[in-house]
């Protein structure tokens, strides 16, 4: 399949260029953009003229196979900051669950305080994981890609090993 150059422009970043083929999926370009900008794939919208490109489709499906250079525009979608219901799962025999209402902008420290309110485990003794990552102080919940219904897993520090 013929190769071409994909040029992506946006308001926030300098021009980005990638080598691509017409059989490549749009998602591959999304991943290149994510690697350079740290903008998650779901927060990106790629435009060809005014047409929104779908991640699962091949570039050739947009009728641009005769070009050597594809010019795309990147728009970044800011996720809303409404409260999201999350389930906190405690470690232990029962695996008790608690409902927490958390914003994407909530700090990890704020979430740990919420957890203390429902479990009585102080923040310093909490180990909380979300989407396979340990929550770190100084970060916000958006850093962990939370969605409605995401699970938080709580384990407490074990003394003596």
Swiss-Prot record:
Pfam families: ubiquitin (PF00240)
Listed GO MF terms: proteasome binding
GO terms for cellular component: aggresome; cytoplasm; nucleus
Principal location: nucleus
Alphabetical list of InterPro entries matching this protein: Ubiquitin-like_dom, Ubiquitin-like_domsf, Ubiquitin_D, Ubiquitin_dom
Inducing or repressing factors: Possible cell-cycle regulation with highest expression during the S-phase (at protein level). Probably rapidly degraded by the proteasome.
Entry-linked SUPFAM superfamilies: Ubiquitin-like
Subunit structure, interactors included: Interacts directly with the 26S proteasome. Interacts with NUB1; this interaction facilitates the linking of UBD-conjugated target protein to the proteasome complex and accelerates its own degradation and that of its conjugates. Interacts (via ubiquitin-like 1 domain) with the spindle checkpoint protein MAD2L1 during mitosis. Present in aggresomes of proteasome inhibited cells. Interacts with HDAC6 under proteasome impairment conditions. Forms a thioester with UBA6 in cells stimulated with tumor necrosis factor-alpha (TNFa) and interferon-gamma (IFNg). Interacts with SQSTM1 and TP53/p53.
Family: Belongs to the ubiquitin D family.
Protein name (database record): Ubiquitin D
Gene symbol of the encoding locus: Ubd
């Amino acid at each position: 399949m013929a190769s071409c150059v994909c040029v992506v422009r946006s308001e926030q970043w300098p021009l980005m260029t990638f080598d691509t083929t017409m059989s490549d999926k749009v998602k591959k370009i999304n991943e290149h953009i994510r690697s350079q900008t740290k903008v998650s794939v779901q927060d990106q919208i790629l435009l060809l003229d005014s047409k929104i490109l779908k991640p699962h489709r091949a570039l050739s499906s947009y009728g641009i196979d005769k070009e050597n250079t594809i010019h795309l525009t990147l728009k970044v979608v800011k996720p809303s900051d409404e409260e999201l219901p999350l389930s906190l799962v405690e470690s232990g025999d029962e695996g008790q669950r608690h409902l927490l209402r958390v914003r994407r902008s909530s700090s990890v420290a704020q979430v740990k305080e919420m957890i203390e309110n429902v479990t009585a485990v102080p923040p310093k003794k909490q180990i909380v994981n979300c989407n396979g990552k340990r929550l770190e102080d100084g970060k916000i919940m958006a850093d962990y890609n939370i969605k409605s219904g995401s699970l938080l897993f709580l384990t407490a520090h074990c003394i003596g090993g």
